[in-house]
Regions:
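A short beta-turn/strand-edge loop motif at beta-sheet boundaries
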Residues: 45-46, 73-79, 93, 204-209, ...
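Low-complexity, intrinsically disordered segments enriched in Ser/Thr together with acidic residues
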Residues: 115-141, 249-276, 389-420
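Secretory targeting and sorting signals
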Residues: 1-37
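Short beta-strand elements of extracellular/lumenal beta-sandwich folds
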Residues: 50-79, 184-207, 316-349
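A surface/secretory-pathway sequence property marking extracellular, secreted
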Residues: 39, 78-117, 211-250, 347-389
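Surface-exposed, proline-enriched loop/turn segments that connect beta strands in immunoglobulin-like
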Residues: 47-53, 98, 180-185, 228-231, ...
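Low-complexity, acidic Ser/Thr/Pro-rich repeat tracts that form intrinsically disordered stalk/linker regions
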Residues: 2-6, 32-61, 95-107
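Extracellular/luminal low-complexity Ser/Thr/Pro-rich, glycosylation-prone repeat/linker regions
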Residues: 36-45, 73, 147-179, 281-313, ...
Length: 454
């Protein structure tokens, strides 16, 4: 069972909500220190695939099955992880080969994990089983592997994983295409042409009668070569991330254990606006055949180019008498030369943060602009807030601008009333973007009723 990363925070918020419901936090009533200090918590989790397909035939290579342990709270150190694996449910279906950190005994094994991490960049599965179909197993045979785990650490000295982690194993017959060999590239330059070969291996027990390969590149990459078997297309316009796609149908049969490569190795050309790019390859068997294990039908590799993108915040100057409503058109601009796309994280590329000038009230905010308190916290009302944060999409092209028109009511005339307009990453504070060569223009002003120059 893989637990959502945000559950710990949700649990703490739930405890606070319960306190509210009980009347512990009421207007004018001081909250005891014990109520403010929620008890620390930590929990152990098992990460394992819910399903695993195996090709029919005991003589075929086994399938790796990656299993890992992690815990919630990085305030605690968790060690001496002990993962129990029960394969009694695989009798007559599959055989398991154990790694060196597992000690088998009959149909169970105890696998050790010296240090249990929190889920993040440093995490990787610590136990890799090798599973293949049992001799004599029939197509459609099914079994189950179950897991349990404990470790040392946490607030109580011991943490234990929920007892509902398992992997369902199914024996199937058919092709199983697997993409490999696609390697990431760092330090490339705009204008470079890179060779990025990949292979497709049939790990199944039946041959694939041809295959379809879909090659997708992000906006900063182009495919300089064409293949007769491919139809090229682009995705542009609206909120869709701009991409290039080649859909290719090859009639070459791929035997069990055999491999397929393109007629010529894949090449990609970096455009002048390239920055953080990606190449994706997905495949499926031809003639409508079903792939036994689709999880390895896809591969992706990053291409990092050395480039810059000058982000700019644009403020405004407006005038109005008391009682009038005026429009202040704020804007974000990417002066290039690079495009920026947070395709991996899905985060906004930037946010335009406005501190409302004195003497005016926001009566209408643009879509996507969240009201904030002056310190950057949650504000309940969409209008009348002292601060707003307007998020950009997850990508922005060079030499493009996005406007954010605010309707402001002038409550009283304050000469030279000024509010800050600054770019953030969506948080409460300004940031320095690593690709931006001119951070000084990330800040501007909204001025209401500026004093005329003498």
């Amino acid at each position: 069972m893989m637990r959502p990363v945000s559950a710990r925070r949700t649990a703490r918020l739930g405890a606070l909500a319960a306190a509210l419901a009980a009347g512990l936090l009421t207007a004018g009533l001081a909250v005891p220190a014990a109520a403010q200090e929620l008890p620390a918590s930590d929990r152990l989790w098992i990460q394992a695939p819910g399903e695993q397909s195996l090709p029919l035939g005991a003589d075929l290579p086994g399938r790796p099955l990656d299993i890992g342990l992690y815990h919630d709270n990085d305030d605690f150190t968790v060690t001496d992880g002990r993962l129990s694996v029960d394969i009694s449910g695989l009798a007559g279906v599959a055989e398991v080969y154990w790694p060196s950190n597992c000690t088998p005994s009959g149909t169970t094994a105890l696998c050790t994990v010296d240090e249990v991490p929190v889920l993040g960049d440093a995490y990787s599965p610590q136990v890799q089983l090798l599973v293949n179909a049992a001799d004599g197993a029939a197509t459609g045979a099914q079994g189950r592997i179950t897991y349990a785990a404990v470790a040392t650490g946490g607030p109580d000295g011991t943490v234990e994983a929920p007892h509902d982690s398992s992997t369902d194993v199914t024996v199937g017959s058919g092709p199983d295409l697997s993409v490999g060999g696609l390697a990431p590239v760092k330090g490339a330059q705009p204008g470079d042409v890179l060779t990025m070969p990949f292979t497709v291996t049939n790990r199944g027990g039946q041959r694939s009668e041809g295959l379809r390969a879909v090659i997708t590149t992000t906006y900063g990459l182009k495919l300089p070569d064409t293949y007769a078997e491919c139809v090229n297309g682009t995705t542009t316009g609206g909120d869709d991330v701009p991409m290039f796609t080649a859909t290719c149908d090859f009639d070459q049969a791929v035997e069990p254990g055999g491999t397929f490569t393109l007629p010529r190795p894949l090449r990609v050309a970096l455009a002048d606006h390239a920055y953080r790019e990606r190449v994706e390859v997905s495949v499926r068997p031809g003639n409508g055949a079903t792939d036994l294990a689709e999880e390895d039908n896809y591969a992706a590799a990053g291409v990092q180019a050395t480039n810059t993108a000058d982000f700019e915040a644009r403020g405004a100057r407006v005038e109005g008498a008391a009682g009038e409503t005026v429009t202040a058109r704020l804007a974000f601009r990417n002066n290039g030369p690079a495009w920026i796309g947070n395709l991996g994280s899905g985060d906004s590329v930037a946010a335009v943060d406005l501190t409302v000038p004195e003497g005016v009230t926001v009566t209408s905010a643009p879509a996507g602009c969240e009201p904030r308190t002056l310190s950057g916290g949650f504000h309940p009302n969409p209008v009348g807030a002292p601060r707003y944060s307007c998020e950009m999409p997850i990508w922005t092209l060079p030499d493009t601008e996005r406007a954010f028109p605010f309707e402001l009511r002038v409550d009283r005339v304050v000469p030279d009333a000024t509010g800050r307009v600054v770019l953030t990453a969506g948080g409460a504070n300004p940031v320095t973007f690593p690709f931006d060569p001119q951070p000084a223009n990330n800040t501007d002003r909204l001025v209401v009723n500026a004093t005329p120059a003498s």
